[in-house]
């Protein structure tokens, strides 16, 4: 009997980016929400200043710290992805971030804020994965809460 199969998986919400340069922020919103800090992209965009060119890994680590998420950047091979604590963030295509939600010896599933959920074989993922991952875990200062900016339809009229 596999005891890990009895462990409840965290549900990771899919959050799509609305601008090309906010994939990193969208990934942080997904991971934070999976850990119980239910937030959205608009709230994080207002709370954390971002460059028009997007976020670097270092900037994502700073924001994660401010949100109460312990983080560590790792360099690893594709075959080592199943060893990561998920959900975590992967550096993708040299200029993009995705959230890894599942990995085994044959395939991975990522939430790509540009296109949605994707399941890829390791061979298919190989040209995209840069070898850098960011593991994130709640600290004692992490707050489980809902923090979403309401959208007011009156601004459209």
Which residues make up each language-model segment?
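Membrane-integrated ABC transporters
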Residues: 1-157
């Amino acid at each position: 009997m596999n005891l890990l199969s009895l462990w409840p998986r965290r549900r990771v919400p899919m959050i799509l980016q609305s601008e090309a340069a906010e994939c990193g922020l969208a990934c942080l919103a997904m991971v934070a929400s999976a850990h119980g800090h239910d937030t959205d992209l608009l709230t994080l965009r207002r709370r954390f200043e971002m460059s028009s060119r997007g976020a670097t890994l270092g900037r994502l680590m700073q924001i994660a710290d401010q949100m109460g998420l312990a983080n560590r950047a790792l360099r690893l091979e594709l075959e080592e992805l199943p060893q990561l604590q998920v959900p975590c963030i992967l550096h993708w295509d040299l200029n993009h971030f995705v959230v890894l939600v599942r990995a085994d010896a044959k395939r991975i599933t990522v939430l790509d804020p540009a296109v949605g959920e994707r399941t890829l074989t390791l061979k298919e993922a190989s040209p995209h994965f840069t070898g850098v991952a960011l593991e994130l875990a709640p600290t004692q200062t992490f707050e489980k809460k809902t923090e979403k900016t309401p959208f007011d339809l009156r601004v459209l009229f």
